[in-house]
């Protein structure tokens, strides 16, 4: 399948209305492209669910802003940066897409960030994790919504080292995201007085982790940290249990775990794992109500990435409604100027580097006996304020920060 054919994977919502005379929107519509992993290792935590989340945000606006219809299209980047870049260029140059959203896979997101920066299009990220996206590769038009490799690793490292797990070994996905996750976790471990005993890197989409896990097992490290995500994490955790790594006294931790991963693993396998997330469906009445809407359309609870797509698209739509135009520079300024307030975040500030400083939550996976209903998987250990969870703007390396 070539890159242009991928745009055939399209879901569209389009409802017409009469526009106020003052509103100025290009092509008399707002067109949002959800660029995701539709069939690969991140499809459960992003994928079609990300498109559903974007549509829920559009529904909240009545599927129109200032009388202009909201159109949402979807494409699969197959976790390949060149395909992601090709789709982004085609969307912007020939299909008049105003916003690109989602883009799990940091290498793909870095490619899209460069294109949206050059073409002056809004880029709403809820899936990639590399801190470079709000660091040296930041953009005036790029916003990183849900988490990053620092926020998911620092809280987990702090919790485990406080329990006495001082020495670490990393099993890392060999691409931009995995490298960033290992790097940020290593910094956190060392800053807290721990040590890194080594690491090994595996190809994206690995099915056999035996050689990598044997090296981790023989390292003697107290913690075997999985610096990967999605299907890679699921496969690694399952095989680590088969090898007896947790049973042998080593602590197994996934530095990026989503509720979908726990669902796939089952509580019997995942119980006791520690993880940092920015969203959990069962936090309060608002999250439960929104998650019920999502589940009605998908048959499952949302991941934090899918919730983040909803939050980001909703925030963008409110921003352009407020200013009466989808002009990218004006929209970007309004996005930054307005704190995020929705079912996911309350009063979250957006930095000059595009980082959304929402709270993170440290969770522990429940034992099977503690779970009372479907998807009842997490126990809240600690709330980590956004200002603490993320790298400070001044230290991010972003040239936009004054």
What residue spans do the PLM features occupy?
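Extracytosolic ligand-binding ectodomains
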Residues: 21-402
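Bacterial N-terminal signal peptides
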Residues: 5-17
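N-terminal secretory signal peptides that target proteins for export/translocation
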Residues: 1-2
């Amino acid at each position: 399948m070539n890159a242009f054919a991928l745009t055939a994977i399209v879901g569209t919502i389009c409802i017409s209305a009469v526009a106020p005379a003052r509103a100025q929107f290009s092509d008399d519509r707002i067109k949002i492209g959800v660029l995701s992993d539709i069939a690969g290792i991140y499809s459960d935590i992003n994928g079609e669910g990300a498109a559903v989340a974007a549509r829920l945000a559009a529904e909240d606006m009545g599927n129109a802003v200032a009388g202009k219809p909201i159109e949402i299209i979807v494409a699969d980047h197959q976790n390949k940066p060149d395909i992601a870049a090709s789709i982004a260029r085609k969307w912007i140059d020939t299909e008049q897409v105003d916003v690109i959203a989602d883009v799990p896979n940091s290498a793909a997101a870095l490619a899209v960030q460069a294109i949206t920066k050059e073409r002056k299009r809004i880029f709403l990220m809820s899936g990639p994790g590399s801190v470079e996206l709000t660091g040296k590769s930041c953009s005036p038009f790029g916003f990183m919504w849900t988490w990053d490799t620092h926020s998911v690793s620092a809280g987990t490292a702090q919790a485990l080292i406080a329990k006495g797990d001082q020495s670490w070994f990393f099993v890392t996905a060999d691409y931009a995201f995995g490298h960033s996750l290992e790097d940020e976790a290593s910094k956190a471990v060392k800053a807290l007085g721990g040590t890194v005993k080594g690491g090994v890197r595996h190809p994206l989409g690995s099915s056999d982790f035996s050689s990598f896990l044997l090296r981790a097992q023989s390292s003697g490290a107290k913690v075997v940290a999985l610096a990967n995500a999605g299907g890679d994490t699921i496969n690694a955790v399952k095989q680590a249990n088969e090898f007896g790594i947790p049973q042998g006294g080593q602590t197994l931790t996934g530095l990026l775990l989503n509720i979908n991963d726990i669902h796939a693993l089952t509580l019997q396998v995942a119980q006791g794992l520690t993880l940092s997330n920015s969203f959990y469906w069962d936090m309060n009445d608002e999250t439960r109500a929104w998650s019920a809407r999502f589940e009605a359309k998908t048959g499952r609870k949302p991941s934090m990435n899918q919730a983040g797509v909803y939050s980001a698209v909703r925030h963008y739509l409110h921003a352009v409604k407020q200013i009466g135009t989808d002009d990218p520079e004006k929209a970007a300024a309004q996005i930054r100027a307005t704190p995020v307030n929705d079912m996911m975040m309350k009063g979250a500030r957006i930095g000059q580097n595009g980082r959304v400083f929402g709270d993170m939550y440290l969770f522990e996976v429940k034992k099977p006996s503690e779970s009372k209903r479907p998807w009842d998987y997490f126990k809240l250990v600690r709330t980590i304020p956004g200002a603490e969870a993320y790298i400070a703007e001044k230290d991010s390396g972003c040239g936009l920060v004054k």
